[in-house]
Regions:
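Extracytoplasmic catalytic/substrate-binding loops of multi-pass membrane glycan-assembly enzymes
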Residues: 30-44, 55-70, 79, 222, ...
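Transmembrane-helix motifs of polytopic, lipid-linked glycan transferases
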Residues: 86-107, 138, 142
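Membrane-interface transmembrane helices that cradle and orient dolichyl/undecaprenyl
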Residues: 139-157, 190-191, 269-287, 327-333
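Extracytoplasmic
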Residues: 62, 171-174, 221, 346-534
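Loop-to-helix entry region of an early transmembrane alpha helix in multi-pass inner-membrane enzymes
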Residues: 64, 68, 78-97, 259-262
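Transmembrane-helix signature of polytopic, membrane-embedded enzymes
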Residues: 99-122, 150-157, 230
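Membrane-interface alpha helices of multi-pass inner-membrane proteins
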Residues: 120-122, 155-170, 176-181, 208-209, ...
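Hydrophobic/aromatic-rich transmembrane helices and adjacent perimembrane loops
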Residues: 174, 300, 306-346, 362-368
Length: 535
């Protein structure tokens, strides 16, 4: 009890330290900028600054809060990558602080909280994976608080956290919503079991009321049925493209990282087995309320998150695992029977898990990326250098792909020969192009080729593009056939109306074609490129 009280007394300083250290670490690792996948959110956030909203004005696969936060960051900081860098770094920092809080609430141990948080930071999820760390840490903290003191206020807090997770990505809300219901049903109370249905009803009602405004918005601008259908179509295409992976461990090129897949599944199963072993313990219902919801969420999240390629997807499943590891270690430290064997087995398992985490997260490579080894005595200079790079529009190390780097002369041409009202049709996975070009995307699609197809979606895109001014279309050669087959109506529109303006060679296999609308009358010719001007 004294240890638990001391942990609660010291948790705020440790949470602040976790926030500061993690935020600084993630910020300094942005030496090579954001991966192009992250620009799905940066570009969409930039689009929102013009008053164009997801679902109403452009396709949203179910991530409204990620888009809104990117927009808010750019509105506050400016339309530069620094805005997203601060958002993402602080989100990971907040996730670390909340993990400390969740584990202290769950175990009463500050040491285990620090260990769990260190593993979470070490596995290093991709920048766009910050919600998978942040919302799970926040909701697990709410779960643990409710188990420790089941009050109506904490029921509502759980509902708020779950709805926040839903708005980040809808499946997060589903997984964590189920976990919240299990937490309420399993938390021991003074009365009969049926009395737990009352807080469950409050939880469901609060969540429903909180999410109703968003559902009403979706119904108003497109309809819930159409939204759900489009989301399912998108999810199915993503699942077909990025399937769940069960890698070989022995003989694998990276056995420690591959082993982490099985460790992520083993941890919740072992936690449930340990729970069964405690079935005669007077604390069993309390343990069940702590473990079963997190284990259930872990298994659902594992199956959903752990997809190909593992190098980018595997770290996303870290939070349920480290929370359960902390709980298991606490049970091991409390063991009386077979204590030496339990501690030895637990130590070996922890070492294996830690080694897998460090390997999967490339911890030492990421530390090297911060340049702290080389300039450990000048941290402020390092921060200044990184900030300067993130404020530049075309800092070379901040450009995510060779194709986009090759388009910089085109972006500079757009500054000279187009207006902010002009849009770009992006026919391939170059989702970062509108952001660097400082031009909005057209047709309500950040890009074609990996987004929503189908005849209904294409007709909506055509209606939108006919109401917009779209002088240019950018078509990378590796997506040309996909546009022709999947977006045949868009392809027909482009062939009838656009002509080739120039080609940008990227590699022997990749060429980016820039098409121009042949029906638009130019005001003159650009002196540097001789391309048509439309200002």
């Amino acid at each position: 009890m004294n240890q638990s009280r001391a942990a609660h007394d010291w948790r705020w300083p440790v949470m602040i330290a976790a926030f500061v250290i993690t935020t600084g670490f993630r910020y300094l690792t942005l030496a090579d900028g954001f991966p192009n996948d992250h620009f799905v959110y940066i570009t969409a956030g930039w689009q929102m600054l013009f008053g164009e909203w997801p679902t109403r004005d452009w396709v949203d696969p179910g991530l409204p809060l990620m888009f809104a936060l990117s927009a808010l960051a750019q509105a506050v900081v400016g339309e530069v990558l620094l805005a997203e860098a601060l958002l993402v770094s602080m989100a990971f920092g907040l996730a670390a602080a909340l993990t400390v809080a969740a584990v202290v609430e769950l175990t009463g141990s500050l040491g285990l909280a620090v260990l769990a948080t260190a593993l979470e930071v070490a596995v290093f999820p991709r920048t766009y994976g910050y919600p998978k760390v942040l919302v799970y840490a926040a909701v697990f903290w709410c779960f643990a608080r409710y188990v420790n003191q089941p009050t109506p206020r904490r029921v509502v807090a759980m509902a708020i956290a779950v709805v926040g997770a839903f708005l980040f990505r809808h499946d997060h809300g589903l997984f964590l919503g189920i976990g919240g219901a299990l937490t309420i049903l399993l938390t021991p109370g003074d009365g009969p079991w049926r009395h737990r249905l009352r807080p469950l009803a409050v939880y469901v009602a609060a969540g429903t009321l909180l999410v109703l405004p968003y559902l009403a918005y979706v119904q108003l601008y497109g309809g819930i049925a159409s939204y759900v259908s489009a989301g399912i179509d998108f999810s199915q295409r993503e699942a077909a493209r990025q399937w769940h992976v069960w890698p070989a461990v022995f003989g694998d090129a990276d056995p420690l990282a591959s082993a982490l897949v099985y460790e992520f599944y083993a941890i919740p199963l072992v936690a449930l087995l340990v729970l069964v072993a405690f079935r005669r313990d007077s604390r069993w219902w309390r343990f069940a309320a702590q473990v079963v919801p997190v284990a259930a969420v872990a298994l659902m999240a594992n199956y959903n998150f752990i997809r190909d390629p593992l190098v980018t997807r595997l770290p996303d499943a870290i939070v349920p695992a480290v929370v359960l590891v902390a709980w298991l270690l606490m049970r091991g430290l409390e063991a009386r029977r077979y204590r030496p064997a339990i501690l030895a087995a637990g130590t070996l398992a922890l070492l294996l898990f830690s080694a897998s985490v460090v390997r999967a997260g490339d911890l030492f490579g990421n530390i090297d990326r911060t340049s702290l080894w080389a300039e450990w005595d000048h941290p402020l200079r390092l921060l200044g250098t990184r900030t300067s790079e993130l404020q530049q529009r075309f800092a070379r190390r901040q450009i995510p792909t060779r194709a986009t780097a090759g388009l910089i002369p085109f972006f500079e041409y757009l500054d000279r020969c187009s207006t902010p009202d002009h849009r770009l049709l992006v026919g391939g996975y170059l989702v970062e192009v509108p952001f660097f070009a400082r031009r909005r995307f057209a047709a309500g699609q950040p890009y074609f080729g990996g987004s929503f197809g189908g005849e209904e979606g294409q007709r909506l895109a055509l209606r939108r593009i006919r109401e917009e001014i779209v002088p240019f279309a950018i078509i990378p050669s590796d997506y040309a056939s996909a546009i022709e087959s999947r977006f045949y109506l868009i392809d027909q529109y482009l062939r009838a109306r656009y002509m080739l303006m120039t080609e940008v060679p990227v590699s022997d296999e990749l060429v980016v074609s820039i098409l121009v609308d042949s029906t638009m009358v130019p005001s003159g010719r650009d002196r540097e490129t001789s391309w048509p001007c439309f200002r």
